[in-house]
Amino acid sequence: MKPLLSLDRVSVSRDGRNVLDKLSLSLAAGERLALIGDNGVGKTTLLRTIVGLEPASGEITAFGINCRNESDFRKIRAKAAYLFQDPDDQLFCPTVIDDVAFGPLNLGLSRQEAMELSNGLLHDLGLGHLAGRITHHLSGGEKRLVSLAAVLAMQPQVLLLDEPTNALDEKHLERMLAILSAQKIAMIIVSHDWEILERLTDRAVVLRNGKLLPAMLHRHSQWSEQVHLHYVEAEGSAL
């Protein structure tokens, strides 16, 4: 079976250095991939590159489309939903329901269809009580959940999640994890919280020096409950 997403020898340069250096990656349908790395190593750049928001060399293929121009990437962004680190970058409509309906409207649904879909989704996610709220007045945790609802409303095949649980309190964290765990679609998740990644993902890679290293998140329960990371192959292996 062909992967949903495939990157082949993709490079992104910034200030004279390669942030991504002839990097290759594939993501299968339903697969949940943890993307791990130090601050500033290029994890966000990689997510942005997948959806055409960073100029890059190499080959990006998604959903059977070999992406060569902005028109191609617009088609990709309808199927690969990107959740930004900062929900304020994603939410710009007056009310929650307007923010959630924005994507479906852009995909061609009528106003009535978009509102019905968005209200139903908010209800299913346990967020129906927020529908009429002014987005600007929400708490940080509520904004993050609403931004997730907004990308899910586009009914994507892949979620690209950039620090989705960062700075959430316990209540909103558990709600976020419950929502993500219930999704049956592929994901790439960037997070510094290995405990969260172990719960949500089934494969891990580490971004270092512009390359991806295959890795494994696990715990040795007989010694420690703390999740830790193992590199499992040599650098340069096909991913």
Curated annotation (Swiss-Prot):
Enumerate the spans annotated as ABC transporter domain.
5-234
The record ties this protein, via Gene3D superfamilies, to: P-loop containing nucleotide triphosphate hydrolases
Q: Which Pfam families match?
A: ABC_tran
Q: Name one GO cellular component term.
A: ATP-binding cassette (ABC) transporter complex
InterPro entries (alphabetical): AAA+_ATPase, ABC_transporter-like_ATP-bd, ABC_transporter-like_CS, ABC_transpr_CbiO/EcfA_su, ECF_ABC_transporter_ATP-bd, P-loop_NTPase
- What sort of enzyme, by top EC class, is this? translocase
Q: Which CDD domains match?
A: ABC_cobalt_CbiO_domain1
Q: Topology with regard to the membrane?
A: Peripheral membrane protein
Q: Which domain of life is it from?
A: Bacteria
Nucleus: is it a keyword of this entry? no
Positions of ATP binding = 37-44
An MF annotation (GO) of this entry: ATP binding
Q: Which PROSITE patterns does UniProt cross-reference here?
A: ABC_TRANSPORTER_1, ABC_TRANSPORTER_2
Q: Can you tell me which family this protein belongs to?
A: Belongs to the ABC transporter superfamily.
Q: What does this protein's UniProt record list under function?
A: Probably part of an ABC transporter complex. Responsible for energy coupling to the transport system.
Recorded protein name is Putative ABC transporter ATP-binding protein BAB1_1388
User: Which organism's genome codes for this protein?
Assistant: Brucella abortus (strain 2308)
